[in-house]
């Protein structure tokens, strides 16, 4: 089987593709990953048992074409590979096009997306948000769910570190690069809207690289105004992220456009609920008040109301642990992913 990917950075989409490698190998496939360059995740594919070819010319459809036609089955990862899908549509090789993209990913690529797909192509997405983004430009495409699987980090032996952010208070964290669509400014405004006596009862942590100056400035101003309660950390190691998930009370994802935020899923692994924007893939899976909370309209005031409730009732969030774990096991566990991916591959290859 051949997997086509645009560059191989260490970010959500390639890491998720890595999780498909052992499943495909267990089905008897040899896995070859083809991308134009290595952005840092190449070793993850090799460790998972795949072969990897990086070649800048593989963006030229004819170059990837010959290899793809020799494969039993092709996974095309993300909407940026639309040209490859267009080239393979209508051929004899089964193609699974797996979408992880936000609405923001579409304007510059929409003209390359085929208007019709051949019988050999099936489209899958990591949830309703990613499907809605494609449906905004191709409403007639049939898109099925294929949510990524994450390992059960809570069952692993990792080096536990007391990160020191709790300070004996409920801790609410957000993790991810600082860009406008991630909505750090909305979270900052919500923290400012809290009554002072409520804000003082909690700690807030922002983790991520500063990609957007406006987002970073809003966090810097907040840490300057409330140095006892609001903290910023550029990056944490994988083990420190796991420690954070263990130590936090809950997570906050204020994104304006986010297909399926990985850190929210990591929180579920440790039984931690999140407060998320309706513009996240996670929102479509949450049962309000049972395994998380959803606010609407990118409204900091609505987020502040939910935050205040969570700060005043940390025991309520702690009691959601079982339901959060259930949500992970049902939708995001390696077992759930393997079951869905196997069924998708079998369905596609049976058509041959």
Label for each model-derived stretch:
Residues 68, 235-236, 243-248:
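Short alpha-helical donor nucleotide-sugar binding micro-motif in glycosyltransferases
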Residues 34, 273-276:
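Short hydrophobic beta-strand element within catalytic cores of glycosyltransferases
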Residues 39-48, 203-228, 240:
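Short, structured helix-loop element that forms part of the nucleotide-activated donor/catalytic region
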Residues 256:
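Aromatic "clamp/platform" in nucleotide-sugar-dependent glycosyltransferases that forms part
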Residues 288-289, 293-300, 309-314:
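Conserved acidic donor-binding segment of nucleotide-sugar-dependent glycosyltransferases
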Residues 1, 6-8:
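Short, small-residue-biased leader/transition segments that mark boundaries at the very start
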Residues 302, 309, 316-331:
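A short, well-ordered alpha-helix in the C-terminal region of glycosyltransferases
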Residues 3, 166-182, 188-191, 205:
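Conserved donor-binding/catalytic core segment of Leloir-type glycosyltransferases
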């Amino acid at each position: 089987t051949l997997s086509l990917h645009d560059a191989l950075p260490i970010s959500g989409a390639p890491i998720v593709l890595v999780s498909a490698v052992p499943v495909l190998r267990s089905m008897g496939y040899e896995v070859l990953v083809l991308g134009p360059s290595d952005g840092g995740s190449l070793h993850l594919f090799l460790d998972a048992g795949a072969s990897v070819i990086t070649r800048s010319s593989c963006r030229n459809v004819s170059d990837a074409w010959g290899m793809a036609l020799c494969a039993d089955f092709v996974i095309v990862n993300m909407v940026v590979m639309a040209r490859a899908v267009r080239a393979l549509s209508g051929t004899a090789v089964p193609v699974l096009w797996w979408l992880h993209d936000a609405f923001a990913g579409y304007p510059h690529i929409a003209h390359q997306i085929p208007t019709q797909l051949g019988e050999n192509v099936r489209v899958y997405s990591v949830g309703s948000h990613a499907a809605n983004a494609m449906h905004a430009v191709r409403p007639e495409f049939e898109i099925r769910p294929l949510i990524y699987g994450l390992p059960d980090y809570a069952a692993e032996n990792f080096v536990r570190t007391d990160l020191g952010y709790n300070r004996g208070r409920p801790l609410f964290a957000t993790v991810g690069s600082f860009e406008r669509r991630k909505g750090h400014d909305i979270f900052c405004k919500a923290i400012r809207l809290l009554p002072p006596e409520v804000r003082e009862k909690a700690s807030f942590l922002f983790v991520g690289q500063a990609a957007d100056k406006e987002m970073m400035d809003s966090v810097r101003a907040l840490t300057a105004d409330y140095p006892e309660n609001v903290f910023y950390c550029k990056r944490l190691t994988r083990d420190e992220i796991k420690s954070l998930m263990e130590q936090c009370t809950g997570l906050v994802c204020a994104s304006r456009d986010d297909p399926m935020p990985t850190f929210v899923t990591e929180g579920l692994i440790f039984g931690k609920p999140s407060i998320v924007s309706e513009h996240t893939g996670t929102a479509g899976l949450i049962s309000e008040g049972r395994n998380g909370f959803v606010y609407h309209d990118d409204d900091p005031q609505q987020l502040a109301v939910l935050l205040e409730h969570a700060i005043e009732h940390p025991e309520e969030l702690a009691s959601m642990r079982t339901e959060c774990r259930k949500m992970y096991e049902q939708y995001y566990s390696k077992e759930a992913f393997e079951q869905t991916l196997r069924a998708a591959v079998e369905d596609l290859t049976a058509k041959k």
